[in-house]
Regions:
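Catalytic P-loop NTPase motifs of RecA-like helicase/translocase cores
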Residues: 98-99, 129, 155
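Cofactor-binding loop segments of dinucleotide-utilizing enzymes, especially the Rossmann-like FAD-
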Residues: 44, 124, 150, 182
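Canonical P-loop GTPase G-domain recognition
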Residues: 153-194
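Inter-motif core of Ras-like GTPase G domains
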Residues: 102-126, 131-148
Length: 194
């Protein structure tokens, strides 16, 4: 790819039209050479994207808000895992996709996918039309995709299995699906014993 990119001869008009894509390609090539992996965490507002990243890095680095989503801009966080094949893994927190219109959502999905090596699409229930729309855009970009059903601790095991099957049945093609509880609910014992 590096050789192909170096040999690519484009006119100034073509450079103008393809400038953004070429910069993305150059960044991807640089990350490949430096053995860096970029994982985007994508989904609707309030599904627990930041909580999932906090759970993966094992510390509460990203702000989370119970009332509503709190991520306003993309933010990359290093994932402290060790691997002989990789020098660095970044987890990228993204704003909620349902805070923008359909056209903007499609552009954001494409931009996030093209700038990543893997996309985690996080949901906290069955797939909504917004999830499906984003999923189709992400799949069209050709990047590996993993769907994560977050907050899986909200359902008894049998209901969770049925929900996971419902999600799999609605996917446009074979996409891996996993359940997670990034910030599991913990029972609190009240002074009155309840």
């Amino acid at each position: 790819l590096q050789t192909w990119r170096q040999m690519l001869k484009l006119s100034s008009r073509e450079h103008g039209l393809l400038g953004g894509e070429l910069r993305l390609l150059d960044r991807q090539l640089q990350r490949l050479q430096q053995k860096e992996l970029r994982i985007a965490v994508f989904g609707r507002v309030g599904v627990g994207k930041s909580s999932l990243i906090n759970a993966l890095i094992n510390r509460p680095l990203l702000c989370t808000d119970v009332a509503h989503g709190s991520t306003r801009i993309q933010e990359a966080v290093p994932w402290p895992i060790t691997s002989s094949e990789l020098n660095r893994v970044d987890l990228v927190d993204t704003p909620g996709i349902d805070e923008i219109g359909a056209d903007g959502r499609a552009r954001l999905a494409a931009r996030v996918a093209m700038g990543s090596d893997l996309v985690l699409l996080v949901v906290d229930s069955d797939l909504t039309s917004t999830d499906l729309e984003a999923l189709k855009t992400l799949l069209a970009c050709g990047k590996p995709l993993q769907l994560v059903l977050n907050r899986s601790d909200r359902w008894p095991e049998q209901e969770q299995s049925a929900l996971l099957q419902s999600i799999r049945d609605r996917l446009p093609r074979d996409v891996p699906v996993t359940a997670a509880a990034a910030a599991p609910r913990r029972p609190v014992l009240q002074p009155d014993g309840s």
